[in-house]
């Protein structure tokens, strides 16, 4: 639900956007120093990729004041063999997805990961619970991709 001026007047009420934001902000704040840079340079921007286009736009607007800037990953970074760069410096692509916990109506599982140049750097799963006011992170697990077939 977007107004003509690009501002959001309403966000879908499924609650998943708030959970995604809580998990993503935690991941952005806690990314390792090693993952914050590409070689000797810091990333020019963080690209956001969410399959829900409204959530993707909302995340970019809500996190607009973060440094490095938050941008739409689709415009600046592709999964092709020729990664696109933004002004000659790389964009770290952040992925967010969320699903409701079928066994608990106020809990959500959020997947947050970051990818650089087709190499999956890290994925984390966040289990969050909503108390009617705020989201609380109950558990964070790193996905071990080294044992994947």
Residue ranges and their predicted role:
Residues 1-107, 111-121, 143-149:
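Flexible low-complexity loop/turn motifs enriched in small/helix-breaking residues
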Residues 123-148:
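Short beta-strand edge/turn micro-motifs at domain boundaries
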């Amino acid at each position: 639900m977007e107004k003509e001026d690009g501002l959001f007047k309403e966000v879908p009420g499924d609650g998943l956007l708030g959970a995604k934001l809580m998990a993503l902000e935690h991941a952005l704040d806690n990314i390792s120093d090693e993952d914050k840079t590409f070689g000797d340079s810091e990333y020019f921007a963080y690209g956001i990729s969410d399959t829900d286009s409204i959530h993707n736009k909302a995340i970019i607007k809500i996190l607009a004041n973060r440094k490095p800037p938050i941008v739409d990953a689709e415009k600046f970074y592709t999964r092709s063999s020729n990664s696109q760069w933004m002004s000659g410096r790389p964009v770290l692509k952040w992925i967010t997805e969320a699903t409701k916990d079928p066994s608990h109506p106020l809990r959500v599982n959020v997947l947050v990961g970051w990818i650089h140049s087709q190499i999956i750097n890290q994925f984390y799963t966040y289990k969050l619970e909503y108390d009617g006011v705020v989201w609380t992170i109950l558990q964070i697990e790193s996905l071990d991709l080294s044992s994947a077939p």
